[in-house]
Amino acid sequence: MTEFQDPFLKSSEPVKFNEKYVDSSVRPGDIGIVDQWAVTPVSDPCVGNLSTPVNSGYFTKAFLNNLPFYRGGLSPNFRGLEVGAAFGYLLYGPYAMTGPLRNTDYALTAGLLGTIGAVHILTALLVLYNAPGKAPNIQPSDCTINNPPADLFTRSGWADFTSGFWLGGCGGAVFAWLLCGTLHLDTIMPIVRGVWAAG
């Protein structure tokens, strides 16, 4: 048994631990696995930005730094084009398959129009973010994003991003509409529509 003196115990008897629960290879001065995975502040501890195993891990950093918003070497317009194309393409499915006209012949066209409407609303929100007061906030580099794009966080950069987002969103929705309207999907579309059928 290993003895341990607890200063908060009222009795002077040391606490005894079973040997199988004590790791004798770790000494108090050693840097163990706990210290390697400890949460530490990035720069100023008063800001509240912490470096954790999740946000400073290799996979998280590689994933976030390869998103179009943070990837290096892209113009703000092309960033917006990529992000908008993904939004338009991914929003088309829910609007076409779960919309109010899902059981009619106009489901695909209604999904296209609903998606383009949603892209217009999101574009208006991006315009409003750039309009009032000061310029968009410039994100400082931290433990996750090493080099945030400085050209994106200016008024002209954000306007270019917004115009690219609108064009990419409408283009992504039209591309998804064209894919769903091909003859190859005629056998699959009734099955997909039947999943969300309302009786």
Swiss-Prot record:
Entry's Gene Ontology BP terms: photosynthesis
Membrane topology: Multi-pass membrane protein
Record carries keyword Cell inner membrane: no
InterPro entries: PSI_PsaL, PSI_PsaL_sf, PSI_suXI
Chain ranges passing through the membrane: 81-101, 108-128, 165-185
Localization (cell): Cellular thylakoid membrane
Gene3D superfamilies hit by this protein: Photosystem I PsaL, reaction centre subunit XI (1.20.1240.10)
GO cellular component: photosystem I reaction center; plasma membrane-derived thylakoid membrane
Stored SUPFAM superfamilies: Photosystem I reaction center subunit XI, PsaL (SSF81568)
Keywords associated with the record: Membrane, Photosynthesis, Photosystem I, Thylakoid, Transmembrane, Transmembrane helix
Predominant cellular place of this UniProt entry's protein: membrane
Domain of life: Bacteria
NCBIfam families the UniProt entry points to: PRK00704.1-1, PRK00704.1-5
Recorded family membership: Belongs to the PsaL family.
Protein name: Photosystem I reaction center subunit XI
UniProt organism field: Prochlorococcus marinus (strain SARG / CCMP1375 / SS120)
